[in-house]
């Protein structure tokens, strides 16, 4: 919050306020919501996190918050609404229904989700609010962001974590640290801030418990897991074997990208310009006409490009040249008519 001074609460007072906040939210509305799980021995709290299913909320969530809690301030940051109740900050985290179960596990137990996310990243995957995902890239270009699984027990198992132990909760922050380091794929190197980009370093330096974890690693001398050295390609093959739907989606994305790249190689502005001598606005108009004037329109033109073999490109070039001549004839005809 930016203008309202807020306080920290002891665990006892936090739980009393949490009961009041949740009772108010669920008594006066049909919102599906719950407190984000916290560490059992946490002595005091600086804010309260409430996870809510966006589909069960009214269109104007801020108006609902004002009506229910009469806060002095409401700050909206993407899908998080922060507001004050009894001089204490409440963060209402709104997620789509498909992400509710994954988000409730990812957000639980303080910094654990972020720590597990570093192990996932080291393996070539992303672990977050929407479960386990894979980003298909071509260099720095993001080709596709593909779901691997939204079943959290399966995601934990893939990352080398015991989901049953996770569901038993954690008493102290050190228990969370031990758990984060328990994966056979865990590597302490993944957490060193100097190995991160500037934005990541700035972000994580502000997170006290993340810094505590790094100090804990140094103090305990925690070693890498027995399988930490496995390459990303190994984990990708594992994921394709364990999650058939992901394997199918990955294959489709790879094929679509390969098709798109080849289309750009055989049909682009430079090729059309070289064949026709056109440039600027005239070139742009012809490019659009080549798509739209093809029998069946743009989708059929793209399908035709995809089926053309390298030895058949002369047919494409002839089509381009014919369309350029046709466009030129049309332009001259229009000029003569206007004269």
Region spans (language model):
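Helical scaffold of the NTase/Pol beta-like nucleotidyltransferase catalytic core
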Residues: 1-37
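Generic non-transmembrane alpha-helical segments
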Residues: 20-28, 64-68, 115-123
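Short secondary-structure junctions
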Residues: 28-37, 63-79, 125-132
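Short, flexible, solvent-exposed loop/turn segments with mixed acidic/basic and small polar residues
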Residues: 36-44, 82-84, 92-94
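Catalytic metal-binding acidic patch
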Residues: 41-62
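Helical (often loop-to-helix) elements that flank the catalytic cores of nucleotide-handling enzymes
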Residues: 55-70, 105-109
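Catalytic cores of NTP-dependent nucleotidyl/adenyl transfer enzymes across multiple folds
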Residues: 83-86, 93-254
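Charge-dense, extended regions
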Residues: 224-339
């Amino acid at each position: 919050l930016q203008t309202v001074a807020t306080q920290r609460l002891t665990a006892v007072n936090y739980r009393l306020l949490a009961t009041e906040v949740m009772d108010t939210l669920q008594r006066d509305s049909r919102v599906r919501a719950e407190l984000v799980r916290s560490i059992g021995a946490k002595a005091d709290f600086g804010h309260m996190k409430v996870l809510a299913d966006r589909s069960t909320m009214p269109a104007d969530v801020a108006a609902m918050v004002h009506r229910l809690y009469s806060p002095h301030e409401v700050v909206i940051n993407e899908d998080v609404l922060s507001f004050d109740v009894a001089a204490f900050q409440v963060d209402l985290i709104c997620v789509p229904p498909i992400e509710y179960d994954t988000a409730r596990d990812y957000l639980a137990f303080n910094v654990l989700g972020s720590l597990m996310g570093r192990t996932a990243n080291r393996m070539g995957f992303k672990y977050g609010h929407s479960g386990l995902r894979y980003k298909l890239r071509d260099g720095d270009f993001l080709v596709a962001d593909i779901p691997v699984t939204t079943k959290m027990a399966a995601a934990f198992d893939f990352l080398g974590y015991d989901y049953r132990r996770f569901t038993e909760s954690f008493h102290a922050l050190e228990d969370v640290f031990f758990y984060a380091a328990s994966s056979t794929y865990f590597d302490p190197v993944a957490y060193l801030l100097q190995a991160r980009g500037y934005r990541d370093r700035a972000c994580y330096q502000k997170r006290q418990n993340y810094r505590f974890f790094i100090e804990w690693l140094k103090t305990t001398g925690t070693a890498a897991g027995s399988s930490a050295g496995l390459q990303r390609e190994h984990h990708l093959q594992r994921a394709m074997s364990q999650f058939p739907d992901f394997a199918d989606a990955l294959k489709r994305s790879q094929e679509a990208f390969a098709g798109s790249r080849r289309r750009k190689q055989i049909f682009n502005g430079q090729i059309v310009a070289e064949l026709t001598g056109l440039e600027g606005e005239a070139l742009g108009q012809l490019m659009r006409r080549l798509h739209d004037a093809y029998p069946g329109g743009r989708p059929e033109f793209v399908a035709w490009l995809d089926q053309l073999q390298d030895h058949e490109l002369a047919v494409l070039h002839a089509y381009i040249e014919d369309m350029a001549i046709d466009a030129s004839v049309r332009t001259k005809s229009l000029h003569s008519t206007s004269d």
